[in-house]
């Protein structure tokens, strides 16, 4: 076995009051990943639930390589960007703290990275815990996407160096940042891929749903995802998303959340000057 001087992959895990989840997450990484391939970087965003003390102990036991401690919650983009700056790998892997990785997850992702050299990011298959059946799970295919989930996303360092890190200025504290990054990568000539060959088990949006409330989460998520589209997509690309946006509105209407969705739309409408300015800056163009 040839030991690499630098890890091939830097796994970046952001934590905020997720003590009950991140311990299992880190244990699954150590159990299911070849040690010579990776380093693990954990950023704690000002947790008050005992996470910090536990993470310090786990670092001493070899479950993580670097621990970054923030005094307050700096948000998803800022937190992950801190991890990227400390990372030594050729690839970054953003991983939610409320997840478990499975056998051969990283090996399979790296095979896909080799297969798709033009891919700036490759999203793993995220399956909710109650729905996962390892015996009957079938690998279907790889797909090119407009965007993939930042909760389990492999990113090439050279792509990140070309287009920049996550946009903390426009997408704080959370939501839309990985969508925006994927759009920027595509506009720079890269591809975004998703594969079923790497499986990540997800317990649910612990940090946001439990601690910020459903209404605030819903408005913020839809505000920022629409903002990412308006910042980066051409008119034909945006029109291609209109049916999906209509379905989102119909679902919100049935669930009594249409008012929240209209609030998200209004947040972007009243910021139209900033949106046009940002489109010009990003050279999004019209067609």
Stretches found by the model and what they are:
Residues 38-46, 66-70:
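Short beta-strand/loop segment that forms part of the nucleotide-sugar
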Residues 92:
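Short aromatic/hydrophobic "clamp" motif used to bind/position activated sugar donors
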Residues 234-287:
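Non-catalytic, C-terminal membrane-associated alpha-helical segments of glycosyltransferases
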Residues 147-164, 169-204:
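A short, conserved alpha-helix in the catalytic core of glycosyltransferases
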Residues 99-134:
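Conserved donor NDP-sugar-binding/catalytic core segment of glycosyltransferases
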Residues 28, 44-53, 72, 102:
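A conserved acidic beta->alpha catalytic loop
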Residues 69-87:
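Glycine-rich, basic loop-to-helix element that forms the pyrophosphate-binding segment
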Residues 27-37:
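Short, acidic, metal-binding catalytic loop of nucleotide-sugar glycosyltransferases
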């Amino acid at each position: 076995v040839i030991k690499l001087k630098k890890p091939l992959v830097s796994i970046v895990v952001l934590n905020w009051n997720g003590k009950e989840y991140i311990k299992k997450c880190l244990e699954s990484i150590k159990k299911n990943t070849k040690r010579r391939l990776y380093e693990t970087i954990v950023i704690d965003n000002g947790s008050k639930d005992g996470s910090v003390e536990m993470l310090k102990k786990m670092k001493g036991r070899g479950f993580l390589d670097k621990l970054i401690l923030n005094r307050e919650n700096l948000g998803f983009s800022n937190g992950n960007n801190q991890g990227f700056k400390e990372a030594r790998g050729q690839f970054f892997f953003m991983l939610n703290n409320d997840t478990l990785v499975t056998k051969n997850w990283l090996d399979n992702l790296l095979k896909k990275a080799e297969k798709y050299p033009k891919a700036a990011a490759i999203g793993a298959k995220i399956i909710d815990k109650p729905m996962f059946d390892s015996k009957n799970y079938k690998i279907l295919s790889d797909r090119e996407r407009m965007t993939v989930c930042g909760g389990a996303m492999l990113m090439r360092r050279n792509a990140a160096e070309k287009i920049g890190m996550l946009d903390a200025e426009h997408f704080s504290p959370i939501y839309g940042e990985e969508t925006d990054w994927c759009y920027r990568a595509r506009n720079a000539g890269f591809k975004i891929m998703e594969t079923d060959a790497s499986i990540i088990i997800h317990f649910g949006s612990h940090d946001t749903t439990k601690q910020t409330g459903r209404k605030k989460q819903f408005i913020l998520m839809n505000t920022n995802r629409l903002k990412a589209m308006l910042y980066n997509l051409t008119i034909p690309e945006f029109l291609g998303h209109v049916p999906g946006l209509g379905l989102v509105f119909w679902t919100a209407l049935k669930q009594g959340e249409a008012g929240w969705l209209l609030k998200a739309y209004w947040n972007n409408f009243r910021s139209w000057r900033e949106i046009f300015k940002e489109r010009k800056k990003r050279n999004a163009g019209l067609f």
